[in-house]
UniProtKB/Swiss-Prot annotation:
One of its GO terms (biological process) is glycine decarboxylation via glycine cleavage system. It is found in: Mitochondrion. HAMAP family: GcvP (MF_00711). Its cofactor is pyridoxal 5'-phosphate. Pfam families: GcvP2_C, GDC-P. It catalyses: N(6)-[(R)-lipoyl]-L-lysyl-[glycine-cleavage complex H protein] + glycine + H(+) = N(6)-[(R)-S(8)-aminomethyldihydrolipoyl]-L-lysyl-[glycine-cleavage complex H protein] + CO2. The glycine cleavage system catalyzes the degradation of glycine. The P protein binds the alpha-amino group of glycine through its pyridoxal phosphate cofactor; CO(2) is released and the remaining methylamine moiety is then transferred to the lipoamide cofactor of the H protein. Gene3D superfamilies: Aspartate Aminotransferase, domain 1, Type I PLP-dependent aspartate aminotransferase-like (Major domain). This is Glycine dehydrogenase (decarboxylating) B, mitochondrial. PANTHER family: GLYCINE CLEAVAGE SYSTEM P PROTEIN (PTHR11773:SF12), GLYCINE DEHYDROGENASE, DECARBOXYLATING (PTHR11773).
Length: 1034
């Protein structure tokens, strides 16, 4: 009866709505964001005769469309900004009748796809369906207690850090701190990280993170080669290093023509005079703790540099490598409060002496002063970096793992020196108790060498012991058939030790407990290796030890930084799009976060299923046949892709093919990546429209026909245009024996419209942190998986501990080596891209590309009467980004891109990419996630700034002392007792009306980069020193 009554009411309401326009809702059948995202047929129900006896009215009713009954939490309408009405209006403003006509005019017909269809999730999952699917995958992962070690450890992630940094969009949606005045918070945190690393390693210089420990070791190897000016071509690695580190170094050495020798320490031989450096592990991969003092003295006596891979937690109680004499120290900060995540992301580090500071890879944060003379932070020595020095750069690494470095730094701040020492001593005590108990049992033999946290055990059958541990949901490391290691960590309990006694008892009764024998256990660290030097003495590491205090410190730093929480970040070639909450949620679920990368794959079936699905989806999107998920950054993907090409040529006997052609319009990291692969780089130019000069390219390819290895091309180009001749370009390279490497930096303008494989590329890396929604994290993490055509699939990277390869797997495999420390790179953040692709569906993700192009063209049209737009396609349109030419303004008004970017801060915006790829310009990329209102607000800001520049040009304001040159204007400057500027405080602070409702304030005046590089300080200084420097520069 109740159901019948409700149906009657529903029928009456529908009938009344139809026959009484005054009560009908005009929005019901309008193509709004809500309705149109469900189905275009929601409002097209057919009229039928109603049952007169049902409701007493002789009226007609409309049926309810089945589409209207589908779930309402669809995702594309939440991600893509423009409604259908807005799309049409914006397209008309640009000069086209609709969005599709704009796309037809922009993307060359010769490479246009008819359509794209997923084999799975084609219609897109709703947000609730996606969460349910991820929960199902998570349930297929088994969380065992890990005692594997090898550089990865369970850790107790402080929840205050988890919630307020890792799960906080105010931290994870920031970009690399290029605009220092609105990035002082994370710059301070990264300076804390560098200080923590330098204190613990005993060396004065550290970078602000690298990708992982293995690649950090490879970077250190490259440094040794550079320090020796390439004259010594052998690098020796101790056999006590982690196997993944050894393999990464071997792979990397090929590009530098270095010979890598793996040897026991006692067998190191420098007699050839050809050794540039050595790598040792401290403590060793199997736990042994050695005093390297004499070893290092001997190496130095032979002109050999020493790299030491170390453990940060161990260094809180061990003599620091710097005091032992090490030249370079590398390692991972993972166990400082960052989950294992099946391999990453984690912040690695590299520390060295002041002597080698300009040879260091990665970002470095330094102390400087602002225009008022007050201390301020910024990225130091940027002239070392790949987008500036290109093939002469120290490394191809861009941003690395800033978000994870910030987590590790906060872990150090939260615990402080005493807290960290307590954790280290507890871990060491648990390992010592375990070793003592095994000796008591007598069923196995324990290594005699001292150890920190890892105990090496010799037994009759290591597999049998590991299987017994498996029954207790514990994973041990099997070294060989007679050797096992057991690594302890912060999460290990005394009860775990008792369980391990039962495992190793092999059926023998255990007559004691860990608690009962613990008082008898002696410290296993030799007196000569006990740390005596204090560390983390700065007040920052000694004042935030309660949750309230740390919460406020984190919040204080966050408040200094502009993120996507505040406004769009229109950095060209960076794709700062929405990082949706549903995409981010699975990242911190224990079922994904707490798995060791070397755990048996049957314990990670949820991950494995996701990898397979993601590989298939990426193949569909790119037109490739197989993918490797191992490269854990865009730069790593570039390197991996080129190494695949190199391996392909080598396998065919074409060892001489080493020439790489790179257009000037290619992505900035390309030359550095090619140089790392040992390639000879030939640059080709562009024409007046920004397109690759095809005839120049043809001549270069034909002239190097016998040695041509690859072309590196970015598409659309970094000039913001779809080049009409891209298919011809690919054919030229193939006809001359080369392979085409496509940089995936601009994939956001390809998805669903064309694809690298369709265009003719052989290999391409994808920036999952751009096109596929992994957040930039203030400078990392990222992922750079590579897709390849079938003929290159056998050469995709593998791993020495857990063999991997292409997804789908090729019929045969000849892997090039190992690219990253973990088998599947930074696996923990892959769910972000996976959920984005699955929720968008093929149509939604195609529309994302279209709207990104629409937004860029809309902005270019709004700005074209105020600034020259440098390059356009054949039909007058741009791709998903465009370049604004400011070069004339330097002559007419003394204004440069930096000035405009700093004034944009006063308007509440992060500046676009400055002076790249063309000096004196700004490159703008809005992405599909920004609303028309936000696009207009940014355009209004740039137009307003152009009017301010016009006042300079007219002579109405001073050429050097004006509101643009004085920008940005922080509160302390505006509230100063004296105001000497020739413009008002009000105009400096509120140049646009919307700022009065809400404004993001910079926290410092314009930072002096030159002063900072001339007076290089890259660690926290005592507070009084900051005050003295400020007074000296005032």
């Amino acid at each position: 009866m109740e159901r019948a009554r409700r149906l009657a009411i529903l029928g009456r309401l529908v009938s009344q709505t139809k026959h009484n326009p005054s009560i009908s809702s005009p929005a019901l059948c309008s193509p709004s964001r809500y309705v149109s995202s469900l189905s275009p047929y929601v409002c097209s129900g057919t009229n039928v005769r109603s049952d007169r006896n049902l409701n007493g009215f002789g009226s007609q009713v409309r049926t309810i469309s089945v589409e209207a009954l589908k779930p309402s939490d669809t995702f594309p309408r939440r991600h893509n900004s423009a409604t259908p009405e807005e799309q049409t209006k914006m397209a008309e403003f640009v000069g086209f009748p609709n969005l599709d006509s704009l796309i037809d005019a922009t993307v060359p017909k010769s490479i246009r796809l008819d359509s794209m269809k997923y084999s799975k999730f084609d219609e897109g999952l709703t947000e609730s369906q996606m969460i349910a699917h991820m929960q199902d995958l998570a349930s297929k992962n088994k969380i065992f207690k890990s005692f594997i070690g090898m550089g990865y450890y369970n850790t107790s992630v402080p929840t205050v850090i988890l919630r307020n940094i890792m799960e906080n969009p105010g931290w994870y949606t920031q970009y690399t701190p290029y605009q220092a005045e609105i990035a002082q918070g994370r710059l301070e945190s990264l300076l804390n990280f560098q200080t923590m690393i330098t204190d613990l390693t005993g060396l004065p210089m550290s970078n602000a993170s690298l990708l992982d420990e293995g690649t950090a070791a490879a970077e250190a190897m490259a440094m040794c080669n550079n320090i020796q000016k390439g004259k010594k071509k052998t690098f020796i690695i101790a056999s006590n290093c982690h196997p993944q580190t050894i393999d990464i170094c071997k792979t990397r050495a090929d590009g530098f023509d270095l010979k890598v020798v793996t040897s026991d320490l006692k067998d190191f031989d420098y007699s050839s005079g050809d050794v540039c450096g050595v790598l040792v592990q401290y403590p060793g991969t199997e736990g042994e703790l050695l005093d390297y003092s004499e070893f290092i003295k001997n190496a130095h006596a032979n002109g050999v540099k020493v790299v030491m891979a170390s453990d940060l937690l161990a260094l809180t109680i061990l003599k620091p490598p710097g005091e032992l004499g090490a030249d370079i120290v590398v390692g991972s900060a993972q166990r400082f409060g960052v989950p294992m995540g099946y391999g990453g992301p984690h912040a690695a580090f590299l520390a060295t002496s002041q002597e080698y500071k300009r040879m260091m890879p990665g970002r470095i944060i330094g102390v400087s002063v602002d225009s008022s003379g007050k201390p301020a932070l910024r990225m130091a020595m940027q002239t070392r970096e790949q987008h500036i020095r290109r093939d002469k750069a120290t490394s191809n690494i861009c941003t690395a793992q800033a978000l994870l470095a910030n987590m590790a730094a906060m872990f150090g701040v939260y615990h402080g020196p005493e807290g960290l020492k307590t954790i280290a001593k507890r871990v060491h005590g648990l390992a010592g108790t375990f070793a003592s108990g095994l000796k008591k049992l007598g069923t196995v033999q324990v290594q005699d060498l001292p150890f920190f946290d890892t105990v090496k055990v010799t037994c009759a059958d290591s597999k049998a012991i590991a299987e017994e541990a498996y029954k207790h949901k514990m994973n041990l490391r099997i070294v060989d058939k007679n050797t096992i290691t057991v690594a302890f960590d912060e999460t290990t309990t005394i009860e775990d030790v008792d369980t391990l006694f039962k495992v190793f008892a092999l059926g023998k009764p255990v007559t004691f407990t860990a608690a009962s024998i613990a008082p008898e256990v002696q410290d296993a660290i030799p007196s000569g290796l006990v740390r005596e030097t204090p560390y983390l003495t700065h007040p920052i590491f000694n004042m935030y030890h309660t949750e309230h205090e740390l919460l406020r410190y984190i919040s204080k730093l966050q408040s200094k930084d502009l993120s996507l929480c505040h406004s769009m970040i229109p950095l060209g070639s960076c794709t700062m799009k929405l990082n949706a909450t549903t995409e981010m949620m699975p990242v911190t679920w224990p079922a994904f976060a707490d798995i060791h990368p070397f755990a048996p794959t049957e314990q990670a079936q949820g991950y494995q299923e996701m990898f397979k699905n993601l590989g298939d989806l990426l193949c569909t999107i790119t037109g490739f046949d197989s993918f490797s998920l191992q490269p854990n950054a865009g730069a790593a993907g570039e390197y991996a892709g080129l190494m695949v090409i190199r391996a392909y040529h080598m396998a065919r006997g074409d060892h001489h093919r080493n020439v790489c052609i790179i257009p000037v319009s290619a992505h900035g990291t390309n030359p550095a990546s090619a140089a790392m692969c040992g390639m000879k780089i030939i640059t080709v130019g562009t024409d007046s429209k920004g397109n690759i000069n095809i005839e120049e390219l043809r001549k270069a390819a034909e002239a190097n026909k016998e040695n041509l290895s690859a072309l590196m091309v970015t598409y659309p180009s970094t000039h913001g245009v779809y080049e009409e001749g891209i298919d011809e370009i690919c054919k030229i390279i193939h006809d001359n024996g080369g392979q085409v490497y496509m940089d995936g930096a601009n994939m956001n303008a390809q998805v669903g419209l064309t694809s690298p494989g369709w265009i003719g590329a052989d290999v391409c890396h994808l920036n999952l942190h751009k096109t596929f929604c992994i957040p930039h994290g203030g400078g990392g993490p990222g992922m750079g998986p590579i897709g390849v055509k079938k003929h290159l699939a056998p050469y995709l990277p593998s791993h020495p501990v857990v063999p991997t390869g292409g997804i789908p797997a090729p019929e045969q495999s000849q892997p090039l080596g190992t690219i990253a420390a973990a088998p599947w790179g930074s696996a923990l953040i892959l769910p972000i891209s996976y959920t984005y692709i699955a929720m968008m569906g093929s149509q939604g993700i195609t529309n994302a590309s279209k709207i990104a192009i629409l937004n860029a063209n809309y902005m270019a049209k709004r700005l074209e009467n105020h600034y020259p737009i440098l390059f356009r396609g054949v039909n007058g349109t741009v791709a998903h980004e465009f370049i604004v030419d400011l070069r004339p303004l330097k002559t007419t008004a003394g204004i440069e891109p930096e000035d405009v970017a700093k004034r944009l801060i006063d308007y509440g915006f992060h500046g676009p990419t400055m002076s790249w790829p063309v000096p004196g310009t700004l490159m703008i990329e809005p992405t599909e996630s920004e609303s028309k209102a936000e696009l207009d607000r940014f355009c209004d800001a740039l137009i307003s700034i152009r009017q301010e520049i016009a006042e300079i040009e007219k002579g109405n304001v001073d050429f050097n002392n004006n509101v643009i040159k004085g920008a940005p204007h922080p509160p302390q400057l505006l509230m100063a007792d004296k105001w000497t500027k020739p413009y008002s405080r009000e105009y400096a602070a509120y140049p646009a009306p919307w700022l009065r409702a809400a404004k993001f304030w910079p926290t410092t005046c314009r930072v002096d980069n030159v002063y900072g590089d001339r007076n290089l300080i890259c660690t926290l200084q005592p507070p009084q020193e900051y005050e003295e420097k400020a007074e000296a520069t005032a």
